[in-house]
Amino acid sequence: MEGFDDIIHQPLRLRIMAALHAARKFDPLEFARLKKLTGATDGNLGSHLNALEAAGYAAITKDFVGKRPRTRAAITTAGERAFRGHTDCLRDLINEARD
């Protein structure tokens, strides 16, 4: 099915991508904020962010603010295209099921 993306379709990854998509015009989302938005645990969020980064859908940056580590994530151009394609495909499936 064109547009359907197995990487994004996993429920937590879909929530992560939705949050990154919504924040795309602003600064990257900090790990703690993304964790709160998605309801993920530290380990789950880290693992799924790594999978999205490996697919080229998310860019992860790590730095320090003072002495505290900071991890942030942003959607990439490829991630934006994949997310839009996937959500368009889901929308079409839902509309077909309603008809």
Locations of the language-model features?
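N-terminal helix-turn-helix DNA-binding core of bacterial DNA-binding proteins
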Residues: 4-41, 65
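Structural motif
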Residues: 11-14, 55, 70
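Canonical helix-turn-helix DNA-binding module
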Residues: 32-62, 67-68
